[in-house]
């Protein structure tokens, strides 16, 4: 399934989950939710790419919410179809 049909919605959910963890401090629940989201993406190639990126960057073993947050920002920016959609990291405040 083409990410242009569901991509923005999924990215919104990912960043909502991260923001919620910033409020409640439950990083383990956040990581479980994020892994569930990524491992059930409707595009097999997207699912594989995101899962490999998470594993290669030790996201699931990190206890630093901002490391996880900025990882997903970088992943988003790497996958943005148009540079105008990229997130300017210099304007992002830590959680």
Swiss-Prot record:
Topology Virion surface: residue spans: 26-95
Paired cysteines (S-S): 43-46
Residues annotated as domain ERV/ALR sulfhydryl oxidase: 1-95
Enzymatic reactions: 2 R'C(R)SH + O2 = R'C(R)S-S(R)CR' + H2O2
E.C. designation(s): 1.8.3.2
Source species of the chain: Vaccinia virus (strain Copenhagen) (VACV)
Cofactor(s) it depends on: FAD
TM ranges: 9-25
Induction data: Expressed in the early phase of the viral replicative cycle.
Membrane topology (Intravirion): 1-8
Gene Ontology CC, one term: host cell cytoplasm
Pfam families according to UniProt: Pox_E10
Source domain of life: Viruses
Main localisation: virion
InterPro entries documented for this protein: ERV/ALR_sulphydryl_oxid_sf (IPR036774), ERV/ALR_sulphydryl_oxidase (IPR017905), Sulphydryl_Oase_FAD-link_ERV1 (IPR006890)
UniProt cross-references to PROSITE patterns, sorted A to Z: ERV_ALR
Function statement: FAD-dependent sulfhydryl oxidase that catalyzes disulfide bond formation. The complete pathway for formation of disulfide bonds in intracellular virion membrane proteins sequentially involves thiol-disulfide transfer between OPG072, OPG128 and OPG088.
Assembly notes: Interacts with OPG128; this interaction involves formation of a transient disulfide-bonded intermediate, allowing disulfide bond transfer.
Subcellular location: Virion membrane; Host cytoplasm
Keywords, alphabetical: Disulfide bond, FAD, Flavoprotein, Host cytoplasm, Late protein, Membrane, Oxidoreductase, Redox-active center, Transmembrane, Transmembrane helix, Viral envelope protein, Virion
Family: Belongs to the orthopoxvirus OPG072 family.
Stretches of the chain forming a coiled coil according to its record: none
GO molecular function terms noted in the UniProt entry: thiol oxidase activity
Protein name per Swiss-Prot or TrEMBL: Probable FAD-linked sulfhydryl oxidase OPG072
